[in-house]
Amino acid sequence: MQELRFVLIVVGALAIAALLFHGLWSSKKEGKAKFGNKPLGKLDVDQGDKDSVEQERSFAPATEDDFEIIRKDRKEPDFGMENTFDSKFEADPLLGGVAEEKHSVKEEAEEIPSFVAMKNDVEDVAIQPSEVEEPMQEVVEEEIMPSAFDAPKQEMEMVEEVAPAVVEQPEEPKPEPEMQVIVLNVHCAGEEPFIGTELFDSMQQNGLIYGEMHIFHRHVDLSGNGKVLFSVANMMHPGTLEHGDPAEFSTKGISFFMTLPCYGEAEQNFNLMLRTAQQIADDMGGNVLDDKRNLMTPDRLAAYRRQIVEFNAANA
């Protein structure tokens, strides 16, 4: 921007100087042509009037008005008629002083262009700012216009940057389903309770392993590794199957339970738990009961399976 402004100022100054030089040259040329067409008789003015004019010029004080007088006399012809003029004054010895005054006036006239040029230069310098300001305004307009056209592009870029942030909204985590528990019981058939030695042996043969919380668990792996599919606790208080000597442990029954959701297929886990409970009941001579300690019926088994299906559908 600064370089362009400097170039425009230099070009404007050169153009103005060229116009001034051409104007001075044209005015000088027109003056010569204008006076050259006049007859010689018109240039012979009254000698007395000429002397009085020249004396007034030689003795007049140098004021600012002299510049006006000099500018008017500057257009007088300075061609071959000056020789005739000078010869007339030089021929008359009485007018020798007047001839000298004539030379002094001519010297002043020759110095006129410098004063005129200086004054014109001052006027030109004063004019330059106003003339140079026009191209500067054009440059500013040229710079503003592209920015106005670029504004929509910038807005579009901002919209494109903001759009992905609006579209990409994090999905809200689904709430965890409410846990449900399915319970089966194996109870002794009479008044005689289960003895720990026989009970624990039957449980171990059906893949149950004593572990955490002092109860038995059925893992995915029969070696006791992996996720727990279901567990077995004491049906009586305090609920644990903790024992020091299995022969001294006894209980009226045990409870099988599994949770929903669970690892793997819930329906398969329920079927495995049901078979294990039935096998232990057969080994111990007991009965399989539901969660309310009623004898298991086909309708109650269907209700258990329906509960599992509805839970899976609600949390699919």
Swiss-Prot record:
Major place of residence: membrane
Keywords from the UniProt entry: Cell cycle, Cell division, Cell inner membrane, Cell membrane, Membrane, Transmembrane, Transmembrane helix
Localization terms from the record: Cell inner membrane
Regions of compositional bias (Basic and acidic residues) in chain numbering: 41-57
GO CC, any one term: cell division site
InterPro entries named among the record's database cross-references: Cell_div_ZipA (IPR011919), ZipA_FtsZ-bd_C (IPR007449), ZipA_FtsZ-bd_C_sf (IPR036765)
Bilayer topology term: Single-pass type I membrane protein
Transmembrane residue ranges: 6-26
Membrane-side (Periplasmic) residue stretches: 1-5
GO biological process: division septum assembly; FtsZ-dependent cytokinesis
Residue ranges, annotated region (Disordered): 36-65
Top-level taxon of the source organism: Bacteria
One Pfam match: ZipA_C
Stretches of the chain found on the membrane's Cytoplasmic side: 27-316
PANTHER family in alphabetical order: CELL DIVISION PROTEIN ZIPA
Family, similarity comment: Belongs to the ZipA family.
Subunit: Interacts with FtsZ via their C-terminal domains.
Function: Essential cell division protein that stabilizes the FtsZ protofilaments by cross-linking them and that serves as a cytoplasmic membrane anchor for the Z ring. Also required for the recruitment to the septal ring of downstream cell division proteins.
Descriptive protein name: Cell division protein ZipA
UniProt organism field: Vibrio parahaemolyticus serotype O3:K6 (strain RIMD 2210633)
Taxonomy of the source species: Bacteria, Pseudomonadati, Pseudomonadota, Gammaproteobacteria, Vibrionales
GN (gene name): zipA
